[in-house]
């Protein structure tokens, strides 16, 4: 059984973290938490 290289482990870890942050951002923008977000364009009076 071969052991994986440290570089591969670090690359996979970084990939998982980036995918997690992206998923969290999409969930915050389009999921249930988006009701708490304010739209500055709607708040601006012309």
Curated annotation (Swiss-Prot):
Chain's role: May play a role in photosystem I and II biogenesis.
Protein name: Protein PsbN
Major subcellular site: membrane
Segments passing through the bilayer: 10-30
Keywords per UniProt: Membrane, Thylakoid, Transmembrane, Transmembrane helix
A cellular component term, taken from the record's GO annotations: plasma membrane-derived thylakoid membrane
Organism of derivation: Prochlorococcus marinus (strain SARG / CCMP1375 / SS120)
InterPro entries recorded: PSII_PsbN (IPR003398)
Disulfide bond residue pairs: none
Keyword Transmembrane helix belongs to the record: yes
Gene name for this UniProt entry: psbN
HAMAP family per the UniProt record, alphabetical: PSII_PsbN (MF_00293)
């Amino acid at each position: 059984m071969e052991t994986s290289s440290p570089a591969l482990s670090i690359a996979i870890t970084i990939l998982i973290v980036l995918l997690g942050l992206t998923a969290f951002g999409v969930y915050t923008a389009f999921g249930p938490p988006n009701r708490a977000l304010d739209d500055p364009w709607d708040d601006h009076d012309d």
